Regions:
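RNase H-like (RuvC/DEDD) metal-dependent nuclease/polynucleotide-processing core
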Residues: 3-6, 11-19, 23-265
Length: 265
């Protein structure tokens, strides 16, 4: 698979690149796949720095909820469909997202009260722990029109399910078996994944970025490269929130029975 290039008005060649992003202990970890054998990784403290660096990317796929309920809906349709395609216990990794108004709460208790008032459901601890990151991405998308077509939501377990031809991962991603299972799949779909992961593990301390964060971001980047013209979404026809942001989870499915080659970007 050849990577496209385009020329700007000044004649400079710009390679079409895809970026996969996942939140990590020190901010945001990203993987950029540029062209065959050319990749970059890094960590940024906030999401605006990622957008500033990669705003010319073909796509930025991020593991964070985009498109938030305001009231009346306790669960997005995309989250329900994601749980439906995943086997137990992977489906438990998809948890309800907070309503937009709860993102500004100062405490977990306050966020729970706000969320229950507008959606009828308290907030999970998992949702509260990423509320700050959800707010970062939400604020960026609402203030940059172009970002809305570039920064898109993914969920790692859905990505691996799709890359694995509709079969969920068998092991928890934080276990050794789970790490190896996911790495084997990524290496099959994108030869060179092992080198990317090995180099990243050698470069950054685990207190900065976890091993599972690296795998999740790489899965997003590989998905963006493999399916850049044919990404699918859950649901097929996404709902939009009150600000116009899509409530969707993107993926690229390698169909069962097909002779799907490994992705050579």
């Amino acid at each position: 698979m050849e990577v496209e290039e385009r020329r700007r008005a000044d004649g400079e060649v710009v390679w079409v690149s895809v970026v996969g992003v996942d939140g990590c202990r020190s901010g945001w970890f990203w993987v950029c796949l540029i062209r065959s054998g050319v990749w970059k990784v890094g960590i940024e403290r906030n999401f605006r720095q990622i957008w500033s660096q990669w705003h010319e990317a073909d796509s930025i796929l991020v593991d964070i909820p985009i498109g938030l309920p305001d009231s009346g809906v306790a669960d997005r349709l995309c989250d329900r469909e994601a749980r439906n395609v995943l086997d137990r216990p992977r489906k438990s990794s998809v948890f309800p997202v907070p309503c937009r108004l709860s993102l500004d709460a100062a405490t977990y208790q306050s966020a729970c009260r706000i969320n229950k008032r507008f959606t009828g459901r308290r907030l999970s601890k998992q949702s509260w722990n990423i509320a700050g990151k959800i707010r970062e991405v939400d604020e960026l998308l609402r203030s940059h029109a172009r970002a809305k077509g570039v920064v898109r939501e993914v969920h790692p377990e859905v990505l691996f399910w799709a890359l694995n031809r509709g079969l969920s991962m068998q092991h928890n991603k934080r276990t050794e078996d789970g790490f190896r299972e996911r790495l084997r799949l990524l290496e099959l779909r994108y030869p060179g994944s092992l080198a990317i992961v090995t180099s990243t593990l050698d470069t950054f301390a685990r207190k900065a970025v976890g091993r599972d964060d690296i795998m999740d971001a790489l899965a997003a980047a590989v998905t963006g490269r493999l399916g850049r013209r044919s990404l699918q979404s859950l649901p097929e026809h996404p709902e939009r929130d009150s600000t116009g942001l899509p409530m969707e989870i993107l993926y690229y499915r390698c169909e069962p029975g097909s002779e799907q080659p490994a992705c050579r970007a």
